[in-house]
């Protein structure tokens, strides 16, 4: 059976995400430094990475962010991701299931993640404009523990065949009220501003995934698919993950914030947690590792990251995630002049 246009696009996305992956490329996390205090008065043995994230208890403040699904190749990737997440004890999100709503024959390319991770925390994923019936189908497909609704206006604008109507807020509110699992509203690499956070909170959303600029760039990916490749000027459009974190500081206590976008190594995770993230996600870095290494090697990498993170906690004098909120730790954050100016521009 010939591959559908949407399934082909999923394969293109994976290939282009890898083509444009630059793991050590500078991003906004480099504009955040941590004041070193030579007497942290901690021990690595005392560090506990376990934390409460919304209604869940996680073994560490890490998760594997949404990537792919919808074709034979991406189904194989999802099976591997399921195994890796299970072995590491990490929550994981699938890529957009929209293609499987239109073509149920590709649903197994998503369900395989649950098949290989029967007891893990798995998030489904749909565009924010989908109706309740589609959301329920997406959840059932994965026996999902939550549903991500992605906001991807910039991607759609650049995508040759993308949507052109972005009236989503009422639908998001309706889905939050109707669904029996938590709804996580996420960006796909262009960040979430404070005004957007306020709109979503008023609509009933209690889980945000900031999905900031700095990692996988869907402007680059979709522009490559355009005949004239004529929208490259949007390459730097959007808010970085760091800017998004600054924008949602001093938020309501019952709003859980996940941060992803440009996470390259454990130090970026530490910085995101210090800036207020409840948990931190990785996509491009994991995909790159998966495409070039065995499952066991990726598992070893992620396990080592968790071990390194414990040492970084001790380095800054922290033994639990909730201690990052203390003024003692917040005083260690050193922002670049550019970030200081941005923070001062944020209005409540």
UniProtKB/Swiss-Prot annotation:
GO-annotated biological processes: isoprenoid biosynthetic process
Residue positions binding substrate: 9-10, 155
A Pfam family matched in the record: FMN_dh
InterPro entries: Aldolase_TIM, FMN-dep_DH, IPdP_isomerase
NADP as UniProt keyword: yes
Subcellular location per the Swiss-Prot or TrEMBL entry: Cytoplasm
Cofactor (UniProt): FMN; NADPH; Mg(2+)
EC number(s) reported in the record: 5.3.3.2
Catalytic activity from the UniProt record: isopentenyl diphosphate = dimethylallyl diphosphate
Gene3D superfamilies: Aldolase class I
Superkingdom per UniProt: Bacteria
Primary location class: cytoplasm
Keyword Acyltransferase: no
Cellular component per GO, a single term: cytoplasm
Residue numbers binding Mg(2+): 156
Biological role stated in the UniProt entry: Involved in the biosynthesis of isoprenoids. Catalyzes the 1,3-allylic rearrangement of the homoallylic substrate isopentenyl (IPP) to its allylic isomer, dimethylallyl diphosphate (DMAPP).
Family statement: Belongs to the IPP isomerase type 2 family.
Listed name of the protein: Isopentenyl-diphosphate delta-isomerase
Species lineage: Bacteria, Bacillati, Bacillota, Bacilli, Lactobacillales
């Amino acid at each position: 059976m010939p591959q559908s246009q949407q399934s082909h696009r999923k394969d293109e996305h994976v290939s282009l995400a890898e083509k444009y992956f630059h793991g050590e490329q500078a991003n906004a996390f480099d504009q955040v430094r941590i004041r070193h205090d030579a007497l942290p008065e901690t021990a690595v043995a005392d560090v506990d990475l376990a934390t409460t994230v919304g209604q869940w208890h996680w073994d560490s403040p890490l998760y594997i962010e949404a990537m792919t699904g919808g074709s034979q190749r991406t189904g194989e990737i999802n099976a591997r991701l399921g195994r890796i997440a299970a072995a590491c004890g990490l929550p994981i999100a699938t890529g957009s299931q929209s293609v499987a709503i239109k073509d149920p024959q590709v649903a197994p390319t998503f369900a395989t993640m649950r098949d290989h991770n029967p007891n893990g925390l798995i998030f489904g994923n749909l565009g924010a404009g989908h109706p309740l019936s589609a959301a329920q189908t997406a959840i059932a497909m994965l026996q999902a523990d939550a549903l991500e609704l992605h906001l991807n206006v910039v991607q759609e604008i650049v995508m040759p065949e993308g949507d052109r109507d972005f009236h989503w807020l009422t639908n998001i509110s309706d889905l939050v009220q109707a669904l029996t699992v938590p709804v996580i509203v996420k960006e796909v690499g262009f960040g979430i501003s404070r005004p957007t956070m306020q709109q979503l909170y008023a609509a009933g959303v209690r889980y945000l995934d900031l999905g900031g600029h700095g990692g996988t760039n869907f402007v680059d990916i979709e522009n490559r698919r355009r005949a004239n490749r004529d929208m490259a000027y949007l390459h730097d459009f959007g808010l970085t993950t760091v800017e998004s974190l600054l924008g949602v500081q001093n938020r309501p206590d019952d709003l859980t914030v996940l941060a992803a976008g440009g996470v390259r190594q454990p130090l970026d995770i530490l910085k995101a947690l210090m800036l207020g993230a409840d948990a931190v996600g990785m996509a491009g870095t994991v995909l790159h590792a998966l495409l070039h290494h065995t499952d066991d090697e990726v598992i070893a990498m992620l396990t080592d990251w968790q071990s390194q993170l414990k040492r970084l906690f001790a380095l800054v004098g922290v033994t639990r995630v909730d201690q990052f909120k203390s003024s003692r730790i917040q005083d260690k954050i050193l922002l670049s002049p550019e970030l200081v100016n941005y923070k001062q521009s944020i209005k409540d």
